[in-house]
């Protein structure tokens, strides 16, 4: 493995020609290395640190030939999975910078610009100057299409149009965009000085496009539109589609009293979490081969297994649940197997937030198909009286450096450290900054798009504790204007250090967010036990003395956390993360008979569904789904599985009484 590092070095005096580098890694002797070119920052060197494995860090010194001059030892931290690390070093400054803008703000830099990194470290002033509250993306009409991109730090932006919607199509036209001229820091609807736009006469339906953003005169990157609603199959180019081409037959958006499937009392909700691919991928599902693992597999009817029992959509309709929750259905990073087919992926790798995932559609190369098919799914569940909740992941992006956000306005949309590295409260390499005006706007615009365009009935926020309270309350307020019965809840874990504790949308701050729900891990652990970093703890159903916590959970958990109402409490004993209930109880009680084991599972589910609050479960929990081994021969449901599912069906009906 090369473990490549690009080093940019700036000398205030401009003395470069006598300089070289000394590079090394732990446990190995060092060697000389040399600068190979110059750029506007200074000298540039391309280094490799060959090793049979990924290096988490490496070292370098800048020196002259005889070591009369040398810098401090620079330790370069490398992000796992990123093949090439780029750093900026400044003469006299011991800091390793991971952003050019952060390095230019160093007082040791020859042409120091103290405001160069304001978008990261002084965002309130940056937002006041550059914030914009108008529409972004594209607006289509048959006679004219307009494009808008917010890119205040860009020196120039061009619109790139492609010859077709094929991901390999050649460039057809390159058109200059114009920067807005109006500066209005107190009225952001009119503050266009950071917005680039262009209007094109003619019909641009089904045209692929991207933006070419120039950071400096000759330095640019091409990026998809952050506000894209359709993309090429690989997600790298955006596509204009006329609204009338995105309405499948029979689909209609209904809100308020017209949305008769929504619940007036959220505490009656029974939420059923599932993954699009998992739902129908098995050959035992009875779903037609073409639809297995796809959006269409969610609604195919008449499916049966080898025993003649109803499966998939027909089965879900028989359960008595009120909501399904779909694990991420937006466009996420795509992995492929050896045959070039889409590989299994939970979907928590966001790339295009407003675009349905290509891997779930019958034809990823036809950009409207995935939109139409997802709308057909939502309509079918609404017709069956079932709400559809969307699992959203606004807390991080798959790539830090290659996301549309970073390519458009570098270092703005994320929480950054002073040295230009990304904060990583998500554990995924970065965390977004919901407290900044334009990412808050993006989150809200995206949520409203899914609500108004797809008729989504609720949103489950992944790692919600990384978002700020004001943003989450704003989302709740705007959804209330549409329909207050739309659910908003999430993972209120305390993660990251980028926000003050009192600003985090974590469960300990539940009283500050009265219309938002939180997963109740206190109740979960008290009832079933827990697996924490490889160690296991028993809960009530395994004989642990947690009666006090269980009693408080039954009464609404407000003595455990400052919940305002039971509807803020999401009670559960199984979700897609960690051990399934069935597996955990086998680990905690390995000597149980099958009969005793089933009774423990049933007790955990029954206790939880009858507690005050909203009930949440994972697909298959009702028939002892396992992550470790199949329950029946050839992955078939056994008679015992069907009996257990029947037991849950009774419980779900009790919940709605």
What is each PLM-predicted segment?
Residues 149, 154-175:
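Beta-strand-rich binding/interaction modules
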């Amino acid at each position: 493995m090369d473990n490549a590092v690009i080093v940019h070095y700036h000398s205030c005096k401009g003395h470069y020609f006598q300089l070289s580098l000394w590079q090394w890694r732990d446990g190995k002797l060092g060697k000389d290395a040399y600068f190979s070119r110059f750029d506007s920052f200074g000298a540039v060197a391309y280094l490799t640190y060959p090793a049979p494995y990924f290096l988490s860090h490496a070292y370098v010194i800048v020196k002259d030939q005889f070591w009369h001059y040398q810098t401090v030892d620079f330790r370069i931290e490398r992000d796992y999975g990123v093949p090439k690390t780029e750093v900026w070093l400044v003469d006299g400054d011991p800091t390793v910078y991971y952003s050019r803008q952060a390095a230019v703000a160093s007082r040791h830099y020859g042409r120091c610009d103290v405001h160069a990194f304001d978008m990261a470290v002084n965002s309130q002033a940056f937002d006041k100057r550059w914030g914009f509250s108008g529409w972004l993306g594209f607006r289509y009409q048959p006679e004219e299409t307009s494009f808008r991109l917010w890119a205040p730090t860009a020196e120039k932006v061009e619109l790139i149009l492609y010859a077709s919607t094929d991901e390999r199509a050649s460039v057809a036209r390159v058109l200059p965009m114009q920067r807005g001229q109006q500066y209005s820091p107190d009225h952001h609807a009119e503050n266009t000085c950071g917005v680039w736009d262009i209007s094109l006469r003619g019909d641009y339906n089904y045209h692929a496009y991207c933006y070419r953003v120039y950071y400096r005169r000759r330095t640019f990157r091409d990026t998809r539109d952050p506000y894209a609603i359709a993309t090429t199959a690989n997600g790298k180019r955006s596509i204009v589609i006329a609204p009338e081409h995105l309405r499948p037959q029979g689909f209609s958006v209904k809100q308020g009293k017209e949305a008769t499937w929504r619940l007036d009392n959220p505490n009656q909700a029974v939420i059923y979490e599932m993954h699009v691919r998992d739902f129908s991928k098995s050959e035992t599902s009875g779903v037609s081969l073409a639809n297995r693992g796809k959006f269409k597999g969610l609604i195919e009817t008449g499916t049966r297994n080898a025993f003649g029992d109803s499966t998939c959509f027909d089965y879900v309709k028989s359960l008595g649940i009120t909501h399904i929750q779909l694990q991420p259905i937006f466009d996420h990073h795509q992995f492929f197997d050896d045959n070039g087919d889409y590989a299994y992926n939970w979907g928590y790798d966001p790339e295009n937030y407003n675009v349905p995932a290509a891997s779930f559609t019958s034809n990823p190369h036809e950009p409207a198909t995935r939109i139409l098919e997802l709308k057909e799914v939502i309509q079918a569940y609404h017709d069956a009286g079932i709400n559809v909740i969307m699992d959203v992941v606004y807390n991080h992006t798959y790539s830090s450096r290659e996301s549309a956000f970073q390519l458009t306005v570098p270092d703005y949309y994320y929480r950054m450290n002073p040295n230009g590295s990304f904060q990583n409260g998500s554990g995924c390499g970065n965390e977004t900054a919901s407290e900044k005006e334009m990412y808050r706007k993006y989150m809200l615009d995206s949520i409203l798009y899914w609500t108004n365009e797809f008729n989504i009935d609720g949103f489950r926020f992944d790692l919600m504790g990384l978002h700020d309270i004001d943003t989450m309350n704003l989302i709740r307020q705007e959804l209330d204007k549409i329909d207050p019965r739309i659910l908003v809840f999430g993972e209120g874990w305390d993660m990251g250090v980028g926000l003050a504790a009192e600003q985090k949308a974590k469960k300990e701050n539940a009283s500050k967010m009265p219309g938002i729900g939180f997963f109740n891990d206190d109740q979960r652990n008290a009832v079933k036990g827990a697996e924490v970093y490889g160690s296991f703890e028993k809960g009530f159903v395994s004989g642990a003395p947690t009666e006090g916590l269980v009693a408080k959970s039954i009464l609404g958990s407000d003595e455990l956390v400052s919940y305002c109402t039971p509807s803020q409490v999401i009670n559960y004993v199984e979700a897609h993360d960690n051990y399934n209930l069935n597996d955990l109880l086998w680990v905690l009680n390995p000597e149980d008979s099958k009969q005793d084991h089933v009774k423990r599972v049933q007790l955990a589910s029954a206790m939880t569904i009858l507690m005050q609050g909203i009930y949440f479960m994972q697909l298959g929990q009702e028939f002892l789904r396992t992550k470790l081994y199949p329950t029946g021969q050839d992955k078939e449901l056994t008679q015992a599985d069907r009996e257990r599912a029947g037991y849950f069906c009774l419980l779900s009906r009790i919940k709605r009484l």
